[in-house]
Every structure is written in structure tokens, then in C-alpha cells.
Amino acid sequence: MGSRRITLLGALFAVLAVAIEGRTLLTHNLKAEAAETVDAVSSVVAGSAGRQLLVSEPHDYNYEKVGFDWTGGVCVNTGTSKQSPINIETDSLAEESERLGTADDTSRLALKGLLSSSYQLTSEVAINLEQDMQFSFNAPDEDLPQLTIGGVVHTFKPVQIHFHHFASEHAIDGQLYPLEAHMVMASQNDGSDQLAVIGIMYKYGEEDPFLKRLQETAQSNGEAGDKNVELNSFSINVARDLLPESDLTYYGYDGSLTTPGCDERVKWHVFKEARTVSVAQLKVFSEVTLAAHPEATVTNNRVIQPLNGRKVYEYKGEPNDKYNYVQHGFDWRDNGLDSCAGDVQSPIDIVTSTLQAGSSRSDVSSVNLMTLNTDAFTLTGNTVNIGQGMQINFGDPPAGDLPVIRIGTRDVTFRPLQVHWHFFLSEHTVDGVHYPLEAHIVMKDNDNLGDSAGQLAVIGIMYKYGDADPFITDMQKRVSDKIASGAITYGQSGVSLNNPDDPFNVNIKNNFLPSELGYAGYDGSLTTPPCSEIVKWHVFLEPRTVSVEQMEVFADVTLNSNPGATVTTNRMIQPLEGRTVYGYNGAAA
């Protein structure tokens, strides 16, 4: 009986794959064919041992019994003009500006906290292990998404996520995807019943790390068919677990709920870029559905609804909203970022034989490290971003003289703000050679800390393979221990690594600076978007050492925080464009 069940499920996958790979809408006839296949599957599975049926009431609607649309009064709004889902035709999209001032006047969705790696949905997470695997949660109250509708700003709070499987609800240019997730958000404005839904498509490919974690956690805490299964210690980060990896372009339109009563009070946001899902993960959805509803089909999508004259608007993602090295490539010039295509860009190749004496640089002096190069300059109150780059955000600096650089006629005092790493390939090269690791200590004009265009100075530290770096060892162990204990999670920002009676402090001299302080200095830019050309670079030429094991930890943190990312985080070398690179403290040729 088990083999027959597998054969029939395979037949269903084949039917659905024909529709999806053929880039055609799933028609009523094809749906009927799929339904017949599932009828056979359901009759076989009905006697399966060990299957837990739903003990409480199922949905009062069912895709198999009522059909793939809601007729006969089940959907109170059937026949009205703004129903969902729809087929999104990308060659007939309207620009977002055309939506403003119209009857459906709606702004771009401000994702706000949903883009943050620290925005965690963790409180009272519960999942419904029946058809659609809906799970609910309490979202944070701060930094919520916003839409301006008819001149009124609405703040939206995420309330639940569910899935439509084996055939997506929306189609894009006639193509149905094998899975579509819907995150439902409710307006927090008094008296408003407005909803906003984010739709995420999945295409066949590698397993999705979040779905893997969700399904495994759910299965370990309950049985298929159970309702309100609590997922203890389960966290959801929307940026990492749900949103597309790189392109945040979405299609927006006015529509409805896709299940009874199909209320027309939804602002839809269907994202263009698809995530991936494996066949094995889709099989879990089928098992859950059949356990909860033995008479049901494993597809739970409503048929495409007529557009009825509505416009669908394209909201192009800002390239620097969420950048990712594997998705955007190793440069930002080809991603519509004009600010990354200037003539004073970083990183560069430092050719030591052509370094000019620092004394010949008339408008910029050497950096006077002052107390930064002492045992006494210890930064406390530091926090860490557990993600790509492993950034340490420095607390307030101790009393004492901060580093000084004379720029033009002004002595500029710089405050250290943070340090982060670029790994497996350094960003700068020295005589054409990449190092495995490069740290960047970012400092800002202390008199203009609030100015986004304020002068920056960055100290670059190279690492070569060798002995483990003691400071990196301590940092990585603290991260690993706290993740293992559940105190923090991958992708979180601003976490403390302090232990009782053992604070996580940073001393620049002992933890970062090499013993020889010769460095190359030049005018450049940030190496990540927006690539602002406001940086005085100081790349120290004597490397520290890092072990292979430490590099592996950087890779693990990156992949756990950014599924789909590459473990290299370097921008490609930029042209010098006539700039002079200077040598200081004996580094000149």
C-alpha cells in the first residue's frame, strides 16, 4: 500500500509539473485531473496506520468539496469586481506614480523593521498542522510596516503566515509556481479593517532553509492534523526567512481574501523574485493536508479571477534595500546604483613599488592614532550583528585623545564606530594578492556624527593563514555558546556578548593593530552600497594571522544568517582612475 501511495503522489507531482514547467495556467480540466489523482491517493491513505486525524473542526470550506472557486454562496463576495488571485501580466504593469491620487490611492509599502535582521517574530508562535500550515505569532510593536492609503498613514502588524501548495494562487505571465506564501498584516489604525498581504513565490530547486526548520519543528512538536501546536523557541525573521534574497520588486493591486468570505479589503504585494522549495518539502504539505482532511485535494489554490479593469502596479526594489554578494554579484555598478560607479571607488590593488611618500600628500596628513594605539583605550558596551560581516558596534569611547587626521586646514578628530570583516577574499589586494580576511575599523568625524555625508576614515587590517587570532577566537566562542543556549539567534543585530563577570571589550591596539604600523593611504569610498566617496583609507600592510577553523566559523555564520548567500563578501577591485596611493611609516617605495 505504501508503494501505491508513493506512485499516486508521483503522478500528482507529474500533472502539476506539466502545468508549471509549461508556463500555463492550471485550468479547470487540469484541476479536475489533479483532483481525480488525489481522490485515489486519499482512498489509499484512508487506512494508513499511525496517521493522526484532525480532532477539532476543519475549515468550514474545503477545496475538494466546494471546488477551486467559491460558488453557491460560500464566498459572499463572489461576482464582485476586485477579487483575488489574479494573473499578473508584466508587460502591462503601471508605474507606481500612476496609483497616487486615484480611487485606490496607495503608496509604496514601507517594510521598515521587516528588513531588519533583528526583527524577530518569536512570541507565542503556534502552527495549525492542517491544510495550508498556517502559523500565528505576536509581532513586535515597534518599527512596523506602513502604507499611506488615501492620504492616511496606516501601520500594519503581521498576524499570520500560511501557504498555498502545489499550485500558487497568483500567476505571473500565466505561470503558476509550486508554492506561494501569504503573510497577512492587519491595520493598527482605530476602526480600520484594512488588510495588507505579502505574497512570496517559490520555484522548484534547493530546499528552503526556513521551510525545513518550520516543518521539522512542527513535526517534532505535534502530529499532522493537530491544531494550535506550540513551537517552543521558534523564531521567524521576515528578511531572512520569507522575503526574496535580493530583488525586492513587487506587484501591487487592490484585491480580496482568496478564501471565504473573499472580502475586498486587501492591499496585495506579490514579490517578483521567487525563493526555492524542494519536492520533499512539498510532500510534507501533502501529508499534512491529507491527515487533516482525508477527503481533500493537496492543492489549495483558488482559480484566477478576472481583473475587471483594475491596474497592477510595479514597485521596483531599491538595489541597496538588501544587498547580497551572490545575488548582486561582486560589484554594485551593474545594479542601477549610480553612486557605485564613480571615479573614487574602493577597494583597489595596492602596488607597493609605486607608493608615494606620505609627506607629499599636501591635503591629508598621516593618521595620528593617539590613545587608540595604547593598552588603555578599551571600548566597552559593544554589541554584535550576527550576520554577514560579523560587525561589532562599539560603545562610547573611553576618555582620552581620539585619532586625528589633518584634512585641508582642519584637524579632524575621528571616533571609532564599528568593525566588520570581509572573508575568504580580502577586499583590497597588495601587489595583486588577496588575503583570506580583511577587517575594517570604521571611524567618523566626531563633530559631525549625525551627518550621513560626514567624513569617514577606515583602518584596514589584513589576515594571512596561520595561528588562530585570540580575539576572533574569543568572539566566535561567545557567539557559538549563546546561540547554543538559545540566548541569541543567527541574523540578530545589536546583541551583547557579555558574560557574567566577563564583559566583551575591545582594545584596538592589542586586538587589531599589527606590530609594524606601515600603511597605504588613499581617497576612496565605502565598499558596499551606497558606495559613498567619503572615506580616507588606511590599509596596514603587515598582516595578522587567522586559522582555517576560524574562517569556517565566519562561513557558518554567513550561511545560517543569509541562506543562499556566498561565503565570500568582497567587492571586486576598482580602477584607480589616476589617484595616487601614499605610503606612511616606512611603507613608501
From Swiss-Prot:
Q: Which cofactor(s) does the record list?
A: Zn(2+)
Principal EC category? lyase
- What's its job? Reversible hydration of carbon dioxide.
Residues holding Zn(2+): H420, H422, H440
Q: Which SUPFAM superfamilies does the protein's record reference?
A: Carbonic anhydrase
Q: Does this UniProt record's set of keywords contain Lyase?
A: yes
Q: Name the UniProt key words of this record, in alphabetical order.
A: Lyase, Metal-binding, Stress response, Zinc
EC number(s) stated in the UniProt entry for this protein: 4.2.1.1
Q: Which reaction does it catalyse?
A: hydrogencarbonate + H(+) = CO2 + H2O
Q: Quick one: which residues bind substrate?
A: T258, T259
Give every Alpha-carbonic anhydrase domain span: 59-316, 321-585
The family note in this entry says:
Belongs to the alpha-carbonic anhydrase family.
Q: Which organism is it from?
A: Dunaliella salina (Green alga)
The cross-references to InterPro entries, in alphabetical order and at most eight, read: Alpha_CA_prokaryot-like (IPR041891), CA_dom (IPR001148), CA_dom_sf (IPR036398), Carbonic_anhydrase_a-class (IPR023561), Carbonic_anhydrase_a-class_CS (IPR018338)
User: Record's superkingdom?
Assistant: Eukaryota
Q: List the molecular function annotations (GO) for this entry.
A: carbonate dehydratase activity; zinc ion binding
Q: What is this protein called?
A: Carbonic anhydrase
Do you know what upregulates this one? Answer: By salt stress.
